[in-house]
């Protein structure tokens, strides 16, 4: 377990194989999308993974994984939980409200030290949830890039796909994305996650709120083409009435062009431009 504790308590490590933050956007099969469809949970190349997951909860991280990340692992004796959910609100562990006092033994960057015996954290030193779910990769995703998206996990988690380590993430309130193209396969796949209530990041995620844990926002997979928009920044100048877009395209060989379309609230085209990676309209 020392290797795991070293990971959780290392402030210089807050992500492993985790994709960089980006502006929210999703690939679509359509060139035109209605204004009311620009929502976080809508996308043509998306596979929702909310709903029933298998769960094993413990008050402290266990020394070995027990092979729970392996596709053949028998999870029939585990509980079932509907995600997204806060574990404490589902009956696993104790919800803790604290203002300025850390709910664990304060010794930065460590979170596994022994607190006073009358603290909840004395018995629940670092509550840990192990999650498993099976999903079938859509046939039309064959040959495309596949990303797993966790919209919110508190406070840290390790991820496996089909028994292979896919990455690690901290930052409870931001999404975590992992490129799992080389890990998924046609047909059934198994995703497994081990989530920890406390990590070195807990020292920054503090003050005046309920201390909860788990996969508390949506989980889904999505697919992009081999050439895809990785990020974009859009700025508007009200004085000149122009919009400028800076677009980061991955694996672009220059053979494709970009098109920028600005629509008014009714959906009508107000301006458009096409060309290279920097567009103005």
Q: Predicted regions span which residues?
A:
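N-terminal helix-cap/turn-to-beta initiation motif at the start of protein domains
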Residues: 41-50, 70-73
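Predominantly extracellular/luminal regions of secreted and cell-surface proteins
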Residues: 55-56, 60, 67-96
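Beta-strand-rich binding/interaction modules
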Residues: 161, 242-277
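Accessory beta-strand-rich segments of carbohydrate-active enzymes
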Residues: 3-40, 54-58, 64, 86, ...
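Surface-exposed, low-complexity/disordered Ser/Thr/Gly/Pro/Asn-rich loops and linkers
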Residues: 90, 95, 100-121
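Short beta-strand segments of immunoglobulin-like
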Residues: 232-238
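Short coil/turn motif common to extracellular beta-sandwich-like domains
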Residues: 143-145, 239-246
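Glycine-centered tight-turn motifs at strand-turn-strand junctions
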Residues: 187, 276-281
């Amino acid at each position: 377990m020392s290797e795991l504790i070293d990971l959780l308590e290392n402030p210089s490590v807050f992500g492993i194989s985790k994709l960089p933050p980006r502006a929210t956007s999703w690939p679509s099969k359509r060139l035109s999308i209605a204004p009311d469809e620009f929502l976080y949970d809508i996308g043509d190349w998306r596979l929702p993974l909310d709903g029933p997951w298998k769960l094993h909860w413990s008050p402290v991280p266990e020394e070995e994984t027990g092979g729970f990340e392996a596709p053949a692992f028998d999870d029939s004796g585990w509980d079932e939980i509907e995600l997204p959910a806060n574990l404490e609100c589902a009956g696993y562990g104790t919800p803790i409200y604290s203002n300025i006092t850390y709910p664990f033994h304060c010794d930065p960057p460590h979170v596994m030290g022994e607190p006073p015996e009358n603290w909840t954290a004395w018995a629940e030193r670092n509550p840990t949830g192990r999650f498993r779910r099976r999903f079938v990769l859509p046939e039309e995703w064959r040959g495309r890039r596949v990303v797993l998206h966790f919209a919110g996990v508190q406070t840290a988690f390790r991820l496996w796909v089909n028994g292979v380590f896919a990455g690690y993430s901290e930052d409870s309130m931001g999404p975590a994305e992992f490129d799992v193209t080389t890990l998924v396969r046609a047909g059934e796949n198994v995703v497994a996650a081990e989530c920890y209530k406390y990590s070195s990041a807990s020292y920054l995620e503090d003050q005046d709120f309920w201390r909860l844990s788990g996969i508390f926002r949506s989980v889904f997979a999505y697919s992009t083409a081999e050439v895809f928009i990785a990020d974009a920044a859009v700025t508007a100048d009200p004085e000149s009435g122009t919009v400028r877009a800076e677009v980061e395209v991955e694996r672009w060989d220059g053979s494709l062009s970009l098109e920028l379309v600005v629509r008014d609230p009714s959906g009508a085209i107000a301006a458009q431009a096409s060309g290279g990676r920097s567009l103005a309209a």
